[in-house]
């Protein structure tokens, strides 16, 4: 059984506020059927959707980590990424921004003061995951059109794009079950490096990939961590 450490940085403040909200969550969960009888077994659709979402998030974490490593090691991109990393160390302004700033930060779930609403946090997580829909879609298109792209890289990017879309669908469904009357405005932050990716200049394309691989590696871990917390608090499982 996985233990969720309340002291684990940097999410400790979030976890404490989540715990404060747990009674409200259980009250909402009481309106959701505990399970459905299917072939003699009790099947909980909410728990199963959480399992699906977490499995997809784990897949995204693994793929993002593998893609990050491959960009540095594969002959297709290793020289360009080494050059970009060197410029990052030298604090080149353009590369520094690409290396540390992520567009998804604008949608990142955060707590403000002592107020925390599980419904609002889920909505923010939906927009956070949704912020990767466009970048991954366009990355698949651009890599498919580039010459010399290894199949291993292209396959990973396609799998990332597919799993991210399916994870977003899982989150949307979970929100409708936890808060049936919830209304959400999906506002996915735009990716400012999209123009670099679509540029005819190869250096610009690799700069966009540099930004994407750095941010995606961190964001997938953030998403997985929060999904595990939500499953524990909403379903009472795997705490």
Curated annotation (Swiss-Prot):
Reported tissue expression: Placental basal zone cells.
Main location: secreted
Protein's UniProt keywords contain Secreted: yes
CDD domains: prolactin_like
Keyword Signal: yes
Cystine bridges: 35-42, 102-215, 232-239
GO molecular function: hormone activity; prolactin receptor binding
Pfam families hit by this protein: Hormone_1
Signal peptide region: 1-31
Gene Ontology BP terms: cell surface receptor signaling pathway; female pregnancy; mammary gland development; positive regulation of lactation; positive regulation of receptor signaling pathway via JAK-STAT; response to nutrient levels
Family statement: Belongs to the somatotropin/prolactin family.
Coiled-coil boundaries: none
Residue positions the entry lists as glycosylated: 211, 218
This protein's encoding gene: Prl8a4
SUPFAM superfamilies: 4-helical cytokines
Localization annotation: Secreted
Protein name according to UniProt: Prolactin-8A4
Assigned keywords, A-Z: Disulfide bond, Glycoprotein, Hormone, Secreted, Signal
GO CC aspect terms: extracellular space
Superkingdom of origin organism: Eukaryota
